[in-house]
Amino acid sequence: MFTPTICRFDYGQLKVTIETGMMARQATAAVMVIIEGTAVLVTVVAQKEAKPGQTFFPLSVHYQERSYAVGRIPSNFFRRETRPNEGETLTSRLIDRPIRPLFPKDFLNEVQVIATVVSVNPKVNPDIVAMIGASAVLSLSGIPFHEPIGAARVGFINGAYVLNPTPEELKQSDLNLVVAGTKNAVLMVESEANILTEEQMLGAIIFGHEQQQIVIESINDLVKKAGKLKWPFTPKIVDEKLRSCITEEDKKDLSNAYLITDKQERYAKLNEIKTNIIERILKENETVNAEQIQDILYNFEKNLVRQRILKDEPRIDGRDKDMIRALHACTGILPRTHGSALFTRGETQALVTTTLGTSRDLQTIDDLMGERSDSFLFHYNFPPYSVGETGMLGSPKRREIGHARLAKRALMAVMPNIEEFPYTVRVVSEITESNGSSSMASVCGASLALMDAGVPIKSAVAGIAMGLVKEEDKFVVLSDILGDEDHLGDMDFKVAGTSEGITALQMDMKIQGITPEIMQSALHHAKAARLHILSVMNQVISSASSTISQYAPHIYNIKINPEKIKDVIGKGGAVIRALSDETDTKIDISDDGNITIAALSQKSAAFAQQRIEEITANIEVGRIYQGTVTRIADYGAFVSIASAKEGLVHISQIAEGRVEKVTDHLKLKQQVSVKVLEIDRQGRIRLSIKDAIADTSEHKIEDTPVDSSFEESQKQ
C-alpha cells in the first residue's frame, strides 16, 4: 500500500532520516524528517493557478508544536493547542526567510508550508529539523523552486565552532547562530553573540554553510528518486509596446521625484506622477489594465534607484553610500516611567521605556524544550501612524514579534544576571516614525533607556542596518538604509553590538545568495557605523544611573531558616498576604529561605523585615510576650504572640482564683501579656496570663506595656 522513499545521512554527530510517500499523500508533497528522535512532518500545498488580480507572492509558512511530541497534555483550559506561541512564530519566520527568494519572481500561486513537530528529543531542537524538511518538501513537490537549501546551527565554545550544539551546550556557548543557504551562497543568518569580533562571526557563517552541504546533496539525491515533475512555468514577458508608452518626460518626472529627500513629500509627488501616467495610458489603450502599468513603473523606479547607487551617485536622501543619517538622542523624557529614551535617526524614531518589576513579573515559558523563566522582556510596537497610514490595531504581528526578538538578542550579552540585579526588566519600543531600520533604532533606544533606569548593563549597544545593490559582479554596500532602499535593494543586513564586538546579526536576502566577500564588506562598514552611533549615544549617557527611579520598586533580600517558611506564609497564605498589606510591600519566598521584599520606600522595607524577624523568632519558654486574643472558647482563650504564633491560655491560667466564664475577663482583640509555660512536641504553646502578671514586677516585658486596666482588674 505504501512505497516510501527514504534517505539517510550523517550530519556531523547526528543521524538524519528523510522519508516521503508514507504520510499526507494528498498534499502536493510531504516529508517526515527525523534527527535523533526529533521528528517533524512537513507538507506543502500549492494552487495550480494564481488568483485573478494577484500582485504579490502568497507564501505562508506555519510551524506548529504538538504537546504529545514530549508526552504531555496541554495545561490550558481546553487541553489542546491553541494560537501559536512566540517560539512557533519565530520559527515560522526562520523557515520562511531563506526559501522565499528561491521562488521565481513572477510566480504568484498560493503556497502553504506546514511543519508539525510530532516527536522531540530534548537534545535536538526541532527548528533546524523543520528547516531541512521545508527545503526537502519544496524540492520534491515540482513547484517552481530554484534549488534546495541547507540549515545549520553554529555554536562557539572554548574558541571552537560547534555544529548543531545541544541546548545544554548552547548554555556554555558564546554564539547561537542559524545559517541557511544554497550550494553556492548564503541566504539567511540569525544570531545572538557574546560580543564576538567581525572575523569570528564571518567564520561562523562560513563554517555553517560548509557543513550544511551534506544536507543539500542528500536532498538532491532524494529528488532524483522521488521528485515530482516540475510544473510548467513561463516568466511574465514584458510588454515592450506598453513600456514605450512611458515617455521620456514621464521618466524625467519620476527621476526628479527621487531627488526629494523628505519621505512624505516624495511619496506624494510620486503618487501624483504615477496616477497621471496611468490615467493617460488607460485612455490611450483600453486593452491594458492599471496593474500592468504599475508593474512597468515599479521596474523603472527600481532600476533608477539601483543604477544611481551603482554609479556612486547620491542616494535617495542625498547621502553617499557610507553616510549615517542625522542622529538625536535624549533620556528621561517621561516623568513617571522607570527609564525612558527617545532615539531618532533621520526619519526613523523610537520611544523606548524600561520598567522594573519583581520576581512575580517573571515570564514563564513552557514549550517542548521545557519550562523556564525569563527576567528580561522586550516588546516592539509598530503603529500605522509611524508611516503616515491608518490601520487595524490588535495583538502583535509576526514582524513585531521578530523585531522584538532581534532587539532582545542584541542586548542579552550586556544584561546583568538576576543575582547582580534582582529585577524583572521589561523594555518596550514604540516606533513613532519609520523610514528604515526601526529594529536597530529600538536597540539604540533600549540601551539608553536601560541606563536611564539604572540597569547596570555592561556596555552601550547600538545597531545599524546595511543594504546591498548587486548587478552581476558589481555590488555596493549601503550604510543605514532607508525603507525604499530596503524595498528596492537586494539585502537587509542588520548588525548590533558594543564598541568591542557583535551581539546580534540578522541577514535576509532577496536575491539568490551572498558571497563571503560581500559579507566581509558589510561587516566592515557596519562596524564603522556602529562606533559612530555609540559615540553620539555616549554623549547623552555613557553608564547606568547610580540610583533607580523613585517610582520603581526597591528590592531587599533577607535569609531565614527554611523550616520557618511555613510560619511566614501561614495557612493558605494568610500571614504573608496580611504582612504585604500591613507593610505595603511585595514579599516573595523561595524554597531555600531567601526572601525578597519589594517596596517603594526603605522605611516600608525595613518594617517588613522587622515583622518577618518577629515571625521567625524562636519562642522561649519562661519569656513574657505581648499578645492579642484571637479566639475565645469555654475552656480558655487563644492568644497570638510574636506576630503569627498562637498559644492557649487555659481558663485556669487567666487569673488567680476560680474563673467561671472566660468572657468575664477577656474579649476578642484585647491586648494582654502572657508567659510561655511550655511548648510540646507538636509545637503547641501553653500560655499563662496570671503568671505574667505575677512576674511583671520582676521581669521586663519585651514588647509594649501591658494593658494597665486589664492588669488592675486581675488584681481586684
UniProtKB/Swiss-Prot annotation:
Its EC number is 2.7.7.8. Residues 622-690 form the S1 motif domain. CDD domains: KH-I_PNPase, RNase_PH_PNPase_1, RNase_PH_PNPase_2, S1_PNPase. Its cofactor is Mg(2+). It is found in: Cytoplasm. Pfam families: KH_1, PNPase, RNase_PH, RNase_PH_C, S1. It catalyses: RNA(n+1) + phosphate = RNA(n) + a ribonucleoside 5'-diphosphate. One of its GO terms (biological process) is mRNA catabolic process. It comes from the Bacteria. GO terms for cellular component: cytosol. InterPro entries: ExoRNase_PH_dom1 (IPR001247), ExoRNase_PH_dom2 (IPR015847), ExoRNase_PH_dom2_sf (IPR036345), KH_dom (IPR004087), KH_dom_type_1 (IPR004088), KH_dom_type_1_sf (IPR036612), NA-bd_OB-fold (IPR012340), PNPase (IPR012162). Involved in mRNA degradation. Catalyzes the phosphorolysis of single-stranded polyribonucleotides processively in the 3'- to 5'-direction. Component of the RNA degradosome, which is a multiprotein complex involved in RNA processing and mRNA degradation. This is Polyribonucleotide nucleotidyltransferase. It comes from Hamiltonella defensa subsp. Acyrthosiphon pisum (strain 5AT). The gene is pnp.
